[in-house]
Every structure is written in structure tokens, then in C-alpha cells.
């Protein structure tokens, strides 16, 4: 496998499908591991939050909790709560749900 295809496969782990205005989905990809790496879920929640922001704001602060382990073979739904849209800051709360269980907030 060449470097380009490895990079492309890696980036596919972060592609979220828009389901509704504030709901996104990741369909799960078997890459040889049973459990999802926590950094992947963190990145996906940040991507979901960014997809709900119209103006150019950058992440200033990020707080999260891992509640349950995630499974690589199963889809994850990301729900975004729009807490505040201001001139300087935008606040979002994102929940990652897998099989009706909250795995990350």
C-alpha cells in the first residue's frame, strides 16, 4: 500500500455524513481494531461542532468525557447542541452515541 492510499484511508475515518441540521453520522470502518481510539472520537466531535458554525471561529477550549468504549464496526451518531453563537466565541456541546448508548460527551 502506498503512502497516498494510507493517508486517504486514514482521512476516511473522519468523514461524517450530515443527517440533519445538527446531526451527523459515521458509519464505522473495520481497520483491524475492535475498539475506537479515543482521539478519533474526539476529532470527530470537534469536526461535527465545526460543521455547525457559519463564521470563521477557531477552537479555543475543548472538554470531553469518555463514558463507554466505542466499537469500530458500528456507526456513531453525533448530535450537536448549539449553546451560543456570539461575535467572538461559539459554544457547542456534542454527544457521540453508539447503539443508543452515549459513549462520549
Segments (PLM) and residue ranges:
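Terminal targeting signals and extreme-terminal segments of soluble enzymes
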Residues: 1-103
Amino acid at each position: 500500500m502506498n503512502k497516498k492510499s494510507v493517508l486517504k484511508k486514514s482521512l476516511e475515518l473522519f468523514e461524517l455524513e450530515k443527517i440533519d441540521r445538527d446531526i451527523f453520522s459515521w458509519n464505522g470502518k473495520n481497520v483491524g481494531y475492535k475498539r475506537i481510539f479515543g482521539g478519533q472520537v474526539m476529532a470527530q466531535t470537534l469536526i461535527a461542532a465545526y460543521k455547525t458554525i457559519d463564521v470563521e471561529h477557531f477552537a479555543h477550549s475543548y472538554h470531553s468525557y469518555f463514558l463507554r468504549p466505542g466499537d469500530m464496526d458500528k456507526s456513531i451518531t453525533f448530535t450537536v447542541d448549539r449553546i451560543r453563537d456570539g461575535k467572538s466565541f461559539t459554544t457547542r456541546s456534542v454527544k457521540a452515541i453508539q447503539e443508543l448508548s452515549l459513549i462520549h460527551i
